[in-house]
Each structure stands twice: as structure tokens, then as C-alpha cells.
Amino acid sequence: MRRLLLTFAAFAAFFQLATAQEYLPKWQEGYMDIHTIATGRGDATFIVMPDGTTLMIDAGDNGKIKDPQHPDTTKRAGEWQAIYMKKVMEDLPNKTKVDYAMITHFHDDHMGAVLQMLPGKNGLLPNSFISL
């Protein structure tokens, strides 16, 4: 019995490693995808609605160089977030910019990367914003 459990555990671990690098399934109409993008210096949430409308919630970069960045330090947090969102949007028809951007509050770890996504930088965000 112990040998069977060890074999099963080894198989489960191998399966986890084998599938860990697979990309997420492509967005399909009628489904909502929610992506949490963690950079180690500020996070973002990217949502693709069932109709293909996109929403970015926060785009953080706390600017503290001593904090570890993910996946690495070759780009700033906002650049990594933008790369990820653009990759997801490749599957969406006629989509080159995020439809809506929402900043929950005005702290760097929630909005510090917005300037890295404006038109003229990488052009991911819309040209106009509404502030309440």
C-alpha cells in the first residue's frame, strides 16, 4: 500500500511539473477571464468580460528598487503588466487597448505603473480617463 501511495504521489508531482508551464486557455466568448498579475512591486488585475470588453484594475509599481521583481528586473512592473495584458488580448478580435482602467485608490502600489502604459509609452491604455 505504501508503495502504491508513493507511486501515486510521484505521478501527481510529475504531472504538476509537466503542466506548470502551459499557457492559460484562450478566452472564449461567453466566459469571463480574471487574471491577477503579480510583479512583486505592485499588482494588477486584468478582466476579460464575456463580451470581450477588457478592464484593468490597478497597475501598481511601488518604485522601491530593493523589492524583488517578477519575473525579473529587465523591465519595470508596468511593462511586465502591459506585456501580459497584450498577450491575453492577442486572442480578442480587434483589441489593441484596454477598454476600461480603474484605479482603486491613489497609492503607488495601485497606480504607480499607469504612466508606463499611457499612449506614447506602450499605448495600452485609452487616450482619455474619467475621474470621480
Name these PLM-found stretches:
Residues 128-132:
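Short internal beta-strands
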Residues 96-99, 127:
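Conserved acidic residues
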Residues 7-16:
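Bacterial N-terminal signal peptides
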Residues 98-109:
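Metallo-beta-lactamase
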Residues 18-20:
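Boundary at the C-terminal end of the N-terminal hydrophobic targeting segment
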